[in-house]
A protein has these predicted regions:
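Canonical Radical SAM [4Fe-4S] cluster-binding loop centered on the CxxxCxxC motif
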Residues: 1-27
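Conserved SAM/AdoMet-binding glycine-rich loop
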Residues: 32-125
Length: 125
């Protein structure tokens, strides 16, 4: 979905590394075009997006595009626990073929999450 990390604030993320510090996202239409090309060329219908974390807005756009195109795939990827990552968004993602997401939960302590600059709370997760 993208190259790099859109958050870039975690205390442990080395944003001096090119693959983390530079964020370049692809549009939902471009991603859907690429997915459809791979399905046509290879017959593969399972996709694992290995972004550092996909923004909820990008996930929503991709899901909407896949549904509009009637693209029949299974996909999964990585997320940050954002306030906008709602049950409704999860339903939309599932409708588009998303079978799983994994989120980075390094600790279950608000104090440590703040020290790590994760930008989330235990309650959000």
């Amino acid at each position: 979905m993208a190259h790099g990390c859109y958050w870039k604030k975690c205390s442990f993320g080395d944003v001096s590394l090119d693959y983390i510090g530079r964020y370049e996202g692809a549009s939902a239409a471009v991603l859907a075009d690429r997915i459809e090309a791979i399905v046509r060329e290879t017959g593969q219908t399972g996709f694992h997006f290995v972004d550092e974390a996909a923004p909820p807005k990008s996930l929503k756009a991709l899901a909407t595009e896949l549904i509009a195109r009637n693209t029949d795939i299974s996909w999964w990827g990585n997320i940050r626990f954002e306030k906008t990552f709602s049950p409704e968004l999860c339903e939309l993602l599932a409708d588009s073929g998303c079978i799983a997401v994994s989120g980075g939960l390094e600790v279950a302590s608000d104090r440590l999450l703040n020290l790590m600059k994760k930008g989330v709370s235990v309650d959000q997760v």
